C-alpha cells in the first residue's frame, strides 16, 4: 500500500485518481504531478514501484502544501477573518454562507436543520 503525505492510497485505483484522496490535490494537480514526475497516470497504485512512490512523495513534499499544513493554514485564515471583523469573518462566525449566496430559502447546509417555531393557541 502506497502511503503519501500520511494517507494510505487505495490500491485498486489509478494513480491519477488515487492522488486526489490527499487533501489539497485535485484532478488537475494530480495530472500535473504525474506529468512532472513522468509516472504513467493509467497505472494502478498497487503496480507502482517503490522508486515511483518515492518520486511522487518527494515531489509532493517539496512543491505542494497538503493535508495538515493546508488544513492549519485554512483554519488560521478563517480565524484571522473573524478577528479583524471583516464581512466574511462575520459570516463565518454566524455560520452563514460566505460567498454571497441567498439565504431566504436555501443555505440549509450552513445554517443546519430548520428550527421550528411553535405558536401557542390563544385562549
Swiss-Prot record:
Keyword rRNA-binding: yes
Organism superkingdom: Bacteria
Gene Ontology, cellular component aspect: cytosol; small ribosomal subunit
Keywords for the protein's UniProt record, in alphabetical order: Ribonucleoprotein, Ribosomal protein, RNA-binding, rRNA-binding, tRNA-binding
A Pfam family of this chain: Ribosomal_S13
Protein's UniProt keywords contain Nucleus: no
Coiled coil: none
GO biological process terms held by the UniProt record: translation
Disulfide bond annotation, renumbered to this chain: none
GO molecular function, one term: structural constituent of ribosome
Disordered, as annotated region: 92-123
Protein role: Located at the top of the head of the 30S subunit, it contacts several helices of the 16S rRNA. In the 70S ribosome it contacts the 23S rRNA (bridge B1a) and protein L5 of the 50S subunit (bridge B1b), connecting the 2 subunits; these bridges are implicated in subunit movement. Contacts the tRNAs in the A and P-sites.
Family indicated by similarity: Belongs to the universal ribosomal protein uS13 family.
Quaternary context: Part of the 30S ribosomal subunit. Forms a loose heterodimer with protein S19. Forms two bridges to the 50S subunit in the 70S ribosome.
Annotated protein name in UniProt: Small ribosomal subunit protein uS13
